[in-house]
């Protein structure tokens, strides 16, 4: 894309990066991954094949995406070949924010304007306009009537 800013030490392999996106140092983005316009991908982040990141998304430092529920082992214990590999897609919708050190498992959609807390492990879909955190990540707050509301049963954070 146009006006993309890339740090000096990065690994990009057949991916697509939208206009005005910033990619930090020591980031790897694999083939068939897409990062939208006006995104920021912070240092030490791994974006694997099959990940789509829409526009205006923030990715914190050291975020890891996965793309296979059973990586590199077949049912008989052998290493998979490229032909055995089954890429499971992940989608991060526009305006989402993922905190540093989060791990996003495969087959997950992170909704529009959702926020994933630092260090979270996202194992299932994150609804739009929610804040999730923890291992596994769970909903802490939702955006309703223009302000963040504590989710039922949530004990974290201020009121």
Can you annotate each of these PLM segments?
Residues 121, 136-139:
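Conserved switch/coupling elements of ABC/ABC-like ATPase nucleotide-binding domains
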């Amino acid at each position: 894309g146009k006006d993309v800013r890339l740090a000096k030490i990065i690994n990009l392999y057949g991916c697509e990066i939208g206009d005005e996106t910033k990619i930090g140092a020591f980031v790897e983005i694999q083939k068939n991954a897409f990062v939208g316009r006006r995104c920021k991908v912070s240092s030490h982040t791994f974006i694997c094949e099959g990940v789509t990141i829409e526009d205006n998304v923030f990715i914190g430092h050291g975020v890891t995406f996965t793309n296979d529920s059973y990586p590199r082992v077949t049912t008989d214990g052998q290493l998979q070949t490229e032909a055995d590999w089954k890429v499971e897609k992940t989608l991060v919708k526009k305006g989402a924010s993922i905190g540093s050190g989060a791990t996003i498992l495969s087959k997950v959609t992170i909704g529009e304007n959702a926020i994933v807390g630092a260090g979270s492990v996202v194992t299932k879909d994150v609804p739009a306009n929610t804040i999730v955190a923890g291992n596994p990540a769970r909903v802490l707050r939702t955006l309703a009537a223009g302000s963040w509301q504590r989710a039922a049963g949530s004990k974290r954070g201020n009121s």
